[in-house]
Amino acid sequence: MTPPGRLYLLRVRSAPVLLLLGLLLGLPPGAQGFPGVGISPSAARTAYQHPQKHFIQGTLKPAAHLIGDPSIQNSLRWRANTDRAFLRHGFSLSNNSLLVPTSGLYFVYSQVVFSGEGCFPKATPTPLYLAHEVQLFSSQYPFHVPLLSAQKSVCPGPQGPWVRSVYQGAVFLLTQGDQLSTHTDGISHLLLSPSSVFFGAFAL
């Protein structure tokens, strides 16, 4: 049995047609057209003639992608609606936290990149610890609960410039009103650019 949410690529007269499993499952079981699939001839024609429209209509789910604000020092502040960052279909950003619009399964992800000129003092460098965490605050819990967490350390090590990246992502069952936020140690070493530091989630 194919897992829910998988994207199908069908070929009709050698033209690729994208159909979402969610659209197929939403049709009546007895619909005529493709046996065992449950899609009517009219729906199939729509998908064939207007695949982009058909695909977009089937993916109007909550999604958010945030990037770090490089204008703010000593703090990681998230921003949307700029440089490929966005909030769609119910997601909102409040007090540097993403507010979950509806209950369901979400893929939550984040990446940060740290960099430095070298280890100091050079004679006996002190270890530098870096960490990034995605946290959940919910009405079910009176405190922030870690969802994703990663740590790295640099120094002692090579005396030249260094770079460390951390990417995390996983699927979680979230509830409407949940708040997603991040906590970072080593903020002064963040390499703030839209492609290096980001945070987001989307419904499955």
From Swiss-Prot:
CDD domains: TNF. Glycans are attached at N95. GO terms for biological process: cell surface receptor signaling pathway; defense response to Gram-positive bacterium; humoral immune response; immune response; lymph node development; positive regulation of canonical NF-kappaB signal transduction; positive regulation of chronic inflammatory response to antigenic stimulus; positive regulation of extrinsic apoptotic signaling pathway. Its main location: secreted. It is found in: Secreted; Membrane. InterPro entries: TNF, TNF_beta, TNF_CS, TNF_dom, Tumour_necrosis_fac-like_dom. Residues 1-33 form the signal peptide. It comes from the Eukaryota. Keywords: Cytokine, Disulfide bond, Glycoprotein, Membrane, Secreted, Signal. GO terms for cellular component: extracellular space; membrane. The keyword Protein biosynthesis does not apply. It holds the Pfam family TNF. Residues 62-204 form the THD domain. One of its GO terms (molecular function) is cytokine activity. Disulfide bonds join C119-C155. PANTHER family: LYMPHOTOXIN-ALPHA, TUMOR NECROSIS FACTOR FAMILY MEMBER. Homotrimer, and heterotrimer of either two LTB and one LTA subunits or (less prevalent) two LTA and one LTB subunits. Interacts with TNFRSF14. Belongs to the tumor necrosis factor family. Cytokine that in its homotrimeric form binds to TNFRSF1A/TNFR1, TNFRSF1B/TNFBR and TNFRSF14/HVEM. In its heterotrimeric form with LTB binds to TNFRSF3/LTBR. Lymphotoxin is produced by lymphocytes and is cytotoxic for a wide range of tumor cells in vitro and in vivo. This is Lymphotoxin-alpha. It comes from Canis lupus familiaris (Dog). The lineage of its organism: Eukaryota, Metazoa, Chordata, Craniata, Vertebrata.
